Amino acid sequence: MPNLLLTMWDTIKSSNIGILVAAGLGMFAIIGGLSMLSYHYTLSGIKSRTVGDGQHGTARWATDKEIRKTYAHVPFKVRDWRKGVSLPTEQGLVLGCKGKKDELTALVDSDDIHCLMIAASGAGKTAFFLYPNLEYACASGMSFLALDTKGDLARNYGSIAKKHYGYKHISVIDLRNPTRSDGNNLLTLINRYMDIARKQPDNLAARAKAEKYAKILAKSIVSPEGNSDHGQNAFFYDAAEGLLSSTILLLAEFLPPDEEHPEERRHIVSVFKLVQDLLEPARGARGRSRFQLLMDKLPSEHKARWLAGAALNSSEQAMASVMSTVLSRLNSFLDSELEQILCFDSAIDAEKFAAEKSAIFLILPEEDQTKNFMAGLMIQNLSRELFAVADENGGKLKNRVILFCDELGTMPPFDILPLFSAGRSRRLTMVPIIQSVDQLVKNYGKEGASILMDNCQDVICGGFAPNSEAADAFSKALGSRTVLSGSVSRGKNDPSQSLQMMERPLLTADELKSIPKGCFIVQKTGCHPMRTRLRLFLEWGITFEEEYRVEEQAARRVYYADQNALTRAIVRKYPPKLTEQKATRSVKGEGQLHDAPVQEMVVAEDIDYDRMPHKRTPYNLPRQEVDR
């Protein structure tokens, strides 16, 4: 029995010793490990993860849930769409995608927005952004205008829009090859409504529309950059707008095609010719120009006479300055190649463009900058006409319209800011595409560039050049977040590590410059930014078919209006009349009619005083100016 007790005691004693030994070894390992760790603090162990409570910034990326809530997710099925199956109902811009090749889902912003795209040359603006958006625009039935510097958009998508998506109105305005271009007569809508008003004299609405579109066109030509820089010369520019509107209305009203002249003479080049001819001083009427005599032949209540009132009631020198201002603004249209486009009727006008599925491709020659003004004029004039159409339909267009303004930074400045502020609520979406923000600063000034960017609810950027300063600006715009930072110090016996919070940009300029091709950053008003990818058009399932081409046309003859024909047309419609008393005095030779107003004088249309044997005026009839 004692032996058994001794054995049990030895067992208990040995087990306690083992436990004590194990505990001692464990404590030694822990202390040794901590000691070893204290000697091995590394800076690489400090990660820049988000910490704190936004002390230095709260910028972050949008979550998947937020992306699903903000952007419409539309399966991008090109093959089905081109067969008329499963066409999308959401109209908007494609700003990203998810999924794998040929099974992509597009991220579409269907809100009323403008979108600014910033990408350097070669970043894939056409292949990654424009082609998917043009395909989606066709599938969802939106009308669009696309500026095309290379001509690829027109060649590749003209036939697709017409053949697969039922676009009946497709216009290619080729400033590089005018003989392969559709017409673009700036007076198309004015002529149309004036023809209706002429056939239906009681149709006040038609005449009012003609006058409205004439004033829109005159403002776009005389003040392409707006009225802000006119200063003390504001009178001359305002009077020039009125005089140009008046001339356009006279041309549209009195010189339509007829049996004698079946050709269309009502175009912008004829307007220049008329103003130039009417600027000359009138023969036999000292101190008066031909334009003043022409206006005297109109009834006192004619709107063309009222529109030109500021110029007519100014001094001779001031009126000459006003007409010279008009001529200087019209000089840009004097080009034999441009005449092949400007002097023939347009295939599409603003009303068709807004009501039906339509596409306009404007091809700009990169090698000839002198024709770039046409792009600004077309955008400005078309937008203002669309605003007028929207106002007649409750303030919104029936169908969304998108203007893809590629290479906007290389075009001359024009009054584009009102288009951004007024277009969004009318379902008109502007998509300016630039290479650098500095292009906007150069053309529109620092304030203008800032206003333009502030009016863009979406900004998409990518493909920054290695030395681009735009990356710094965009990095600042993305904001900052609060991240972990720290330091490690090593002493002889007591190494230490300290941690703190610091500010870090959401993406640094270096990170922006190293974004792979096809990857973009999207910012939207009221939302966190999104990192997205736009794949190459082939991966979207987009394929091209036969090229769309406008048939080659030989140089067409251009017909111009002249002031003689205009004068005869006015006199035929509003023949001058003599009062009975003055007519009697004239017949009896009781005196000259020197005091008779010019519009009451008898006009001898068939008399050419320069060819008469003598140039003396009969004593009983004042010599009249013969406008030929």
List the predicted regions and their residue ranges.
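Conserved ATP-driven motor cores of ASCE-family P-loop NTPases powering translocation/secretion/packaging/pilus
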Residues: F420-A422, R426-I521
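Basic- and hydrophobic-enriched, low-structure N-terminal and domain-boundary segments
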Residues: M1-A123, A127-E135, S140, T179, ...
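Short intrinsically disordered, low-complexity coil segments enriched in acidic
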Residues: P2-N3, A470-A477, C527-M530
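A short glycine-/small-residue-rich loop at the edge of a beta-strand within enzyme catalytic domains
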Residues: R68, A72, R82, F373, ...
